[in-house]
Amino acid sequence: MPKYRSATTTHGRNMAGARALWRATGMTDSDFGKPIIAVVNSFTQFVPGHVHLRDLGKLVAEQIEASGGVAKEFNTIAVDDGIAMGHGGMLYSLPSRELIADSVEYMVNAHCADAMVCISNCDKITPGMLMASLRLNIPVIFVSGGPMEAGKTKLSDQIIKLDLVDAMIQGADPKVSDDQSNQVERSACPTCGSCSGMFTANSMNCLTEALGLSQPGNGSLLATHADRKQLFLNAGKRIVELTKRYYEQDDESALPRNIANKAAFENAMTLDIAMGGSTNTVLHLLAAAQEAEIDFTMSDIDKLSRKVPQLCKVAPSTQKYHMEDVHRAGGVLGILGELDRAGLLNRNVKNVLGLTLPQTLEQYDITVTQDEAVKKMFRAGPAGIRTTQAFSQDCRWDSLDDDRAAGCIRSLEYAYSKDGGLAVLYGNFAENGCIVKTAGVDDSILKFTGPAKVYESQDDAVEAILGGKVVEGDVVVIRYEGPKGGPGMQEMLYPTSFLKSMGLGKACALITDGRFSGGTSGLSIGHVSPEAASGGTIALIEDGDTIAIDIPNRSIQLQLSEAEIAARREAQEARGDKAWTPKNRQRQVSFALRAYASLATSADKGAVRDKSKLGG
């Protein structure tokens, strides 16, 4: 039977100094011997998805203490990708994921904590904490801050829903008046919470449900709604039960690697494809799988993408539905229920509540449950009041959206598309693959061939797009923006948004070894692997080269002979120590980012650090 990790610091005469310090934090004799549970918070005033988390750690801690544990809270950093977007700040976003994972490991191992409750929400924070949880493999429950309410405003005598992306597009559209742009800006992000569409933050918080590491409702229940408080109260109680199950009953099923096993990862990716989640989730699931020592690769994702339909369509792929609408339609369990009926899920998995997938669906799928409390929870809706306070309203929809023929969530028979919302493309352009969010691609451009316009930084591409140098039919290529080449693998939300602003959203393609915001839509292909800085073919492309994209056949090709590609590769190698670097880019790269780049792998590996370079 495993010994409590915390006993290392709380038992034995030689630990008198450690106990003296624990006493200085408020612990007493009766606490020594109880499980010490880390409350891993990520409160910050920089990020709307985290601005309301300050008191929620205390809420969880109180429940831990009341249930027989000792709670000790600490904070991680949290970068707001939207605020960091479009300037040098975006270089720091993806590297912050590794820092978060490491900082959780450092704190938990340095102080010998026995278990964790992870209070996350936004883009890199949930993945970073997930990586740490699977690396440490001690009992854990995730409870996120919840989605933001959708913005709303009146334009042309019509009430429309809004989000961050609308503000960005209208702000760059020369045809939009200053007054209208200002109106949209002021209405787009009305409350605390993670941005209201199926962007990266909400996608990842939905996936923690599918992985079994969070409770039903975690991915979709609004940050502002009073019902969400119960998730935090339950997490504090449940983590003590899980902790005692492992340490006192030798029950390894309480450990995250036994909950989030390969079958659960396949279910999570199946959900992601069905709901048209952010392409960033591919990056993060690959990284998390490596931490869990699970053999889950781009090949697995490719296989799933070929058989899973799209059953849910949410902003940015449509403005009709946001996360509040997904919740009304049954949330993650609503989508999983339809996937289960279609025979597309592994059923022999459990979650942190100890329920199997069939048991969870029986209780929480709104189309089958008899539990009125569950139905009431899924009617939790927006209040439409600007606020930064969690649990500040208790509005409810009059009815649930259980229309699986024409509602937000569809059955297999009425799927938005028989092809799922994400696809992996291969070809001489991307030998190790690249990712496209097909949910956001118009049917008219699923096949696209055009001449390349090549840029070696996001900034140059934006200048060209806004300057009218990119025209209908072009394929914009932005390279040396991968994990190593950026460094940091910037998101390309501004270039894709500005293509829309210029009326080119359905007339051009954009390809990059960088990545895209969950707010991106259009023919936007990212994660090209190998990246330019690692010798990828994307580094060899020249202006005017023809690129052929064929999403239905999962192909992306540079239409050059093998001999010409080989000649260009030889010329690149002849540059010596300048090979596989940008020719004309001026970019200040800090020591911290250079350190990250020195170990970074390409996106097909999850952009994790190359352990082979560390030895041992």
UniProtKB/Swiss-Prot annotation:
What pathway is this protein said to act in by its record?
A: Amino-acid biosynthesis; L-isoleucine biosynthesis; L-isoleucine from 2-oxobutanoate: step 3/4; Amino-acid biosynthesis; L-valine biosynthesis; L-valine from pyruvate: step 3/4
Question: What InterPro entries does the record point to?
Answer: Dihydro-acid_dehy_C, DihydroxyA_deHydtase, DiOHA_6PGluconate_deHydtase_CS, ILV_EDD_C, ILV_EDD_N, IlvD/EDD_N
- Where, in this chain's numbering, is [2Fe-2S] cluster bound? 122, 195
Annotated GO MF terms: 2 iron, 2 sulfur cluster binding; dihydroxy-acid dehydratase activity; magnesium ion binding
Its Enzyme Commission number(s) read 4.2.1.9
Tell me which residues bind Mg(2+). Answer: 81, 123-124, 491
What keywords is this UniProt entry annotated with? 2Fe-2S, Amino-acid biosynthesis, Branched-chain amino acid biosynthesis, Iron, Iron-sulfur, Lyase, Magnesium, Metal-binding
Q: Give the protein's cofactors.
A: [2Fe-2S] cluster; Mg(2+)
Q: PROSITE patterns, from UniProt?
A: ILVD_EDD_1, ILVD_EDD_2
- Under the cellular component aspect of Gene Ontology, which terms does the record hold? cytosol
Q: Where is the active site?
A: 517 (proton acceptor)
Query: Cofactor binding mode, per the note?
Result: Binds 1 [2Fe-2S] cluster per subunit. This cluster acts as a Lewis acid cofactor.
GO BP terms:
isoleucine biosynthetic process; L-valine biosynthetic process
Q: Which domain of life is it from?
A: Bacteria
Q: Which reaction does it catalyse?
A: (2R)-2,3-dihydroxy-3-methylbutanoate = 3-methyl-2-oxobutanoate + H2O; (2R,3R)-2,3-dihydroxy-3-methylpentanoate = (S)-3-methyl-2-oxopentanoate + H2O
Task: Point out residues bearing the modification N6-carboxylysine.
Answer: 124
Similarity comment: family membership: Belongs to the IlvD/Edd family.
* Role description: Functions in the biosynthesis of branched-chain amino acids. Catalyzes the dehydration of (2R,3R)-2,3-dihydroxy-3-methylpentanoate (2,3-dihydroxy-3-methylvalerate) into 2-oxo-3-methylpentanoate (2-oxo-3-methylvalerate) and of (2R)-2,3-dihydroxy-3-methylbutanoate (2,3-dihydroxyisovalerate) into 2-oxo-3-methylbutanoate (2-oxoisovalerate), the penultimate precursor to L-isoleucine and L-valine, respectively.
Query: Subunit structure, per the record?
Result: Homodimer.
Q: What is this protein called?
A: Dihydroxy-acid dehydratase
